[in-house]
Amino acid sequence: ISTYLVAVYSAPYKSFYDVYQGLDGNDSMKIEYFVMPEHFEESKIDFADHLDMMKTLSQIFGEYPFIKEKYGVAEFLWNYGAMENQTITGIGYAFVGGYDFFKDTYVHELAHHWWGNSVGPKTWNDIWLNEGFATYSEALYAEAKHGKDGLISKMQSKFSDSFRGTLYAPKDLFGETVYEKGAWVLHMLRYEIGDSSFFKSLHNYYDLYKYTNASVEDFKAVCEDVSGTNLDKFFDQWIYTGTENILCSYTFEILKTENGSECTVKLFQEPQDYDEFHFP
């Protein structure tokens, strides 16, 4: 266990639990919820989807890495904060109250048990492998529940004008670049190598580096091995290179044809002093 994931929660908690049945049908474990007594009934609404989240993420990434131990959630006094302490996620008290509104946070912190807790970053320069992956997991869960519309809606909510800088060795370890640009770069990688190769890469990367540490280059090597694609340019442009926002201007022309109309759109990258960026 990484030292930053160690925590002790202490309070006059009341608790309840679900039981998760592992993918192989043999292993099972409790998902236990520890809440302040005054939030006990409301928390059953807030945490109602955790069992489904566990099943869904296990199906996407591979079995929950700590199924021989446990998973749980503990309410703590950090207002709107949350932390993926290993096997017991801390959830700020402001999230608890029967709101059924903070699913993204719950998915994000659970996803860290694959990306960050089980497969840890080799250095803090590789923090994208934690936070970008956990943020994209929110979109993958939305896709699993609501199809492509859910995926698109969730990714649109992650769009920010603060994508400046690199994902590798970022200036702000826990800024929007790492989280939101990180999720978008994974989304782009998915379309660069295709769904089959992308999800197989996630499985292989998890299996290969489970309970150890990995770097961006380790992840890149797995993706290249699975897809048979040279990803040097993709990683150089989107992960190692820091830029201002890459914007586009456009012109269009509509011409009448025998069968109707034909529209020609031309996109121009701005600013133009960067190399031409490749979009899948």
Language-model segment annotations:
Residues 74-76, 92, 97-101, 165-174, ...:
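Active-site-adjacent structural elements in folded domains
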Residues 175-265:
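Amphipathic alpha-helical substructures
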Residues 25-30, 82, 108-113, 154-168:
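Active-site-adjacent bridging/hinge elements
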